A protein has these predicted regions:
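Beta/alpha (TIM)-barrel catalytic core signal, keyed to glycine-rich beta->alpha loops juxtaposed to Asp/Glu
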Residues: 2-204, 209
Length: 211
């Protein structure tokens, strides 16, 4: 709305690119307000948003007495911590929490793609455009996180999920599973608490292999 944004395939903001078809922030909130008042929805949130967009919506809801965005659904994981730059502070200070999607980097943090493996019917084998998840730097990060998980007697999935769950700006973690065993492993991560040393080691990997 009202500007280019990196969502649904758009991966960068261009100040020189004019938007021909857009709806301004206020009209969007007014339309959503009608749905709330008619009983069709209870609360509103957004997805794939930027600090500018979130701030704008929160400002308008306060100044114009319009419904308030209650959550943001953006990607976040051990190998995608871009939410921490700008968005996390807004989430905490404005109490507009993150609903995490892709906490396992579309399955890459399960280790299923290591050593060149490409399981049949996996996301990477079925859909084009996911190669960025398997680039050399990302693969190196997966190796480091798998090593760290083994050192702490947990799986890489549990390391990845418990890290996401521990972040103060995260309200909910949206998990995906195609097998009961995967579901159990994801759910078990709720009971795992990473100590400060493990978090420091995670940050060390992030500093060496940033995303």
């Amino acid at each position: 709305p009202e500007r280019s944004t990196n969502c649904f395939g758009r991966r960068e903001f261009s100040v020189n690119e004019n938007e021909r078809d857009w709806n301004d922030f206020e009209s969007i909130l007014k339309a959503l307000d009608k749905f709330i008042k008619s009983g069709k929805i209870r609360y509103i949130g957004m997805s794939n948003e930027t600090p500018y967009g979130l701030s704008k919506y929160l400002e308008l809801s306060k100044n114009k007495n319009l419904p308030r965005m209650m959550s943001v659904q953006n990607p976040y994981s051990l190998v995608n911590r871009t939410y921490e730059v700008g968005m996390s502070e807004i989430s905490i200070r404005e109490k507009c929490g993150l609903l995490v999607y892709y906490p396992l980097a579309a399955g890459a943090l399960s280790g299923k793609y290591k050593n060149g493996q490409m399981p049949k019917n996996s996301r990477m084998s079925l859909f084009k455009g996911w190669e960025r998840m398997l680039n050399p730097l990302a693969m190196k990060a997966y190796e480091e996180y798998e090593k760290l998980a083994k050192e702490n007697n947990i799986t890489m999935v549990q390391l990845a999920q418990s890290f996401v769950n521990s972040r103060p700006f995260v309200t909910s973690n949206i998990i995906g599973a195609s097998k009961l065993s995967q579901l159990k492993e994801n759910i078990d991560s709720i009971n795992i608490k990473l100590d400060d040393n493990v978090v420091r080691e995670i940050d060390q990997v992030q500093s060496l292999i940033p995303n």
